[in-house]
Amino acid sequence: MKNPLLIDNLLSQKDYDNLLKEIKNPKDFDYDAGFSRYLNDHRGLPVLKELSDKLTQTARNIFNSQTLLSTYTLFAHYEGQDPEPSLFKHKDTNACTYTLDMCVYQNEPWDLWVEDKNYTLYPNQALAYYGEDQFHWREKFPSPETNKVAMIFFHFAEPDHWYFTKGSSYIDVIWGKMTEEEWKLKNE
């Protein structure tokens, strides 16, 4: 796969219904003011780990890699006006070699752009793309006074990725929060 791929019915109906039941109130999740979103991962929402495990073989088939492994999965609920939700143009840096971005629910679609092409996702649809290699972003959030959009970001990488060889804390070196030497001392 080279170009992004739109996938219908990423989850079985049973898994999708169970996911909706498990989410409950996303406003109880951690709030990320920078993107105006509420976040949770597998530690706070265990169903995410279950779904990621189930989708690993699907991701292997889509990305033509029988060795990729799940790195982390993140649930994000976007809403509000102060500030409006946003996602700037970027390439991922945190163990997101392969990405499946799934729409969970929405009042109004909020297109995902990958390499200058927009993709409209509907509930239980996903977009497969290379998060670390392809620029992706979202344009202006539609109808911020009423819209709510929830996404799950399923991320995968190869076993030789730093996430597996050095551990998830190595992101501090990637993001320039500490030097390699400082990280080594801290993790001895």
PLM features: residue spans?
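Short, cationic low-complexity segments
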Residues: 171-188
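Histidine-/acidic-rich catalytic cores in large beta-rich domains
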Residues: 61, 66, 149-153
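Conserved active-site beta-strand element of glycosyltransferases/polysaccharide synthases
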Residues: 77
